[in-house]
């Protein structure tokens, strides 16, 4: 039995939800998201409470049950409070600047890296810290992973782009021969 799937999702007053067949529509004052569900899951929306039930007893139906419960919960949290990820840029000469709809990164390459900011994502840059905010959890995580992939942290000095809560396992350098 899915513990995530059987959870009832409370929809706050700032978010409106509606069910149209197998499609769930969520919106707040600024944005709207929709979630297309599989026919193996039954959706129930009553008194601002959203719940899912598997249609069959097979493993596939139970898997969809938990998946759609988690996806719907992420949309509700995203529209009510939002998601954010913080990246830190460490290294001599590594700089970050916010341009016009682009993030300009100097990461020790022969050229600056220009990352176009996708729609629905907001970025704040303070010194060498990048904060990525948005209502779509998947998109916020994807943008953070793409920016980190330009220069992942290396294990010797820790230079590169890392998540703020990421712990880099450091390696010892070479020792001199005697």
UniProtKB/Swiss-Prot annotation:
**Keyword list, A-Z:** Ribonucleoprotein, Ribosomal protein, RNA-binding, rRNA-binding
UniProt cross-references to InterPro entries, sorted A to Z: Ribosomal_uL6-like, Ribosomal_uL6-like_a/b-dom_sf, Ribosomal_uL6_a/b-dom, Ribosomal_uL6_bac-type, Ribosomal_uL6_CS
- Its source organism is Helicobacter pylori (strain P12)
Determine if ATP-binding is one of this entry's keywords.
no
| Gene (name only) | rplF
Task: Kindly list the biological process annotations in GO that this record carries.
Answer: cytoplasmic translation
Q: Report the protein's function.
A: This protein binds to the 23S rRNA, and is important in its secondary structure. It is located near the subunit interface in the base of the L7/L12 stalk, and near the tRNA binding site of the peptidyltransferase center.
Q: Any idea what this protein is called?
A: Large ribosomal subunit protein uL6
| A cellular component term, taken from the record's GO annotations | cytosolic large ribosomal subunit
Q: Which family does it belong to?
A: Belongs to the universal ribosomal protein uL6 family.
SUPFAM superfamilies, A to Z: Ribosomal protein L6 (SSF56053)
**Ribonucleoprotein: is it a keyword of this entry?**
yes
Molecular-function annotations in GO: rRNA binding; structural constituent of ribosome
Question: What Gene3D superfamilies would the database entry show?
Answer: Ribosomal protein L6, alpha-beta domain
Its subunit composition reads: Part of the 50S ribosomal subunit.
